[in-house]
């Protein structure tokens, strides 16, 4: 499915660039065309996967030359904000669904993929409807194609939990009790790095979903209607504050990937992480600590106006430039 995803996206970018007369350039007498592809996966194992799919596409389409550029997560975000509106915009690039990409849409910088999906029923049918919702606007415009689903879970060190006599928590009160026991046993309860600021938003955003109703959040998360006056947001911050004493020291000065390393090396009994981070932990060839004995559990329940059983998750995907 992913091989087809890349192939069809590349073909879509090719057709779109020829239609607009932009980005697609002649580089030889044989009119070899260039597609610029920008992604945020310079590390293994993802980089090799992308390189393999691109090599396959170029072999099957000798008239196409794909120029690839990649960058780590946070530098990627900053560069993308600069290049998307410029003359050197990549034809295909990774982008997060929601407001991160929708601001580009409001500036007419993202191609509407709806007609391309309608013209290729096999491609359309291969995509999960539940994931496509996140890359579809209210008016029906499909602006991106997901290639994997991400979710947030607490990763925990099984050995440290057992040594401290801690059970997997299912409620927030149980989570705080677990943190106290781990701390008393000499362990850092939660490995945390908030240097880039987004890790805090993942905690608070998850808690918001439990303390604020879906209807209110939908209104507030829309730029034109957001007010953020619901008391549930204050409650969420208060819950988050209860966790702060159990984070490692200097958490705002530590990068998120360093927090992951700390967890992998035993310097943190828990780590609120994305499931896509698993290969960085236990991949036999590239993982930080392939022998780490760890498990996972969802963010413990909080009774509030929202959904106590919520699991924070979102698909990740690619979009095509309209330039």
Predicted regions and their residues:
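Extracytoplasmic "Venus flytrap"/periplasmic binding protein-like
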Residues: 56-127, 134, 159, 163-170, ...
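Glycine-centered hinge/linker elements that transmit conformational signals in sensory
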Residues: 179-182, 222-252
């Amino acid at each position: 499915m992913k091989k087809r995803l890349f192939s069809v996206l590349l073909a879509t970018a090719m057709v779109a660039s020829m239609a607009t007369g932009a980005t697609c350039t002649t580089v030889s007498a044989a009119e070899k065309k260039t597609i610029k592809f920008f992604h945020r996966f310079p590390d293994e194992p993802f980089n090799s996967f992308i390189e393999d799919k691109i090599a396959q596409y170029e072999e099957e389409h000798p008239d196409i030359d794909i120029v690839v550029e990649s960058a780590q997560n946070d530098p990627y975000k900053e560069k993308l904000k600069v290049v998307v509106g410029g003359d050197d915009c990549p034809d295909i690039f990774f982008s997060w669904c929601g407001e991160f990409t929708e601001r580009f849409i409001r500036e007419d910088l993202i191609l509407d993929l709806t007609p391309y999906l309608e013209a290729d029923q096999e491609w359309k049918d291969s995509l999960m409807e539940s994931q496509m919702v996140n890359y579809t606007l209210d008016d029906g415009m499909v602006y991106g194609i997901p290639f994997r689903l991400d979710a947030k879970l607490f990763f925990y060190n099984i050995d440290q939990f057992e040594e401290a006599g801690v059970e997997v928590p299912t409620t927030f009160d149980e989570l705080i009790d677990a943190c106290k026991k781990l701390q008393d046993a000499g362990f850092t309860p939660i490995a945390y790095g908030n240097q880039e600021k987004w890790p805090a938003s993942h905690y608070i955003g998850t808690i918001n979903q439990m303390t604020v109703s879906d209807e209110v959040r939908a209104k507030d998360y829309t730029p034109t209607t957001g007010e953020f006056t619901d008391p549930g947001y204050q409650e969420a911050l208060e819950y988050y504050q209860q966790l702060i004493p159990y984070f490692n020291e200097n958490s705002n000065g530590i990068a998120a990937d360093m927090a992951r390393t700390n967890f992998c090396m035993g310097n943190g009994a828990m780590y609120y992480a994305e499931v896509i981070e698993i290969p960085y932990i236990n991949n036999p060839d590239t993982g930080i600590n392939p022998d780490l004995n760890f498990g996972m559990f969802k963010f413990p329940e909080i009774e509030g106006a929202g959904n106590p059983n919520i699991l924070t998750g979102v698909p990740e995907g690619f979009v095509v430039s309209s330039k």
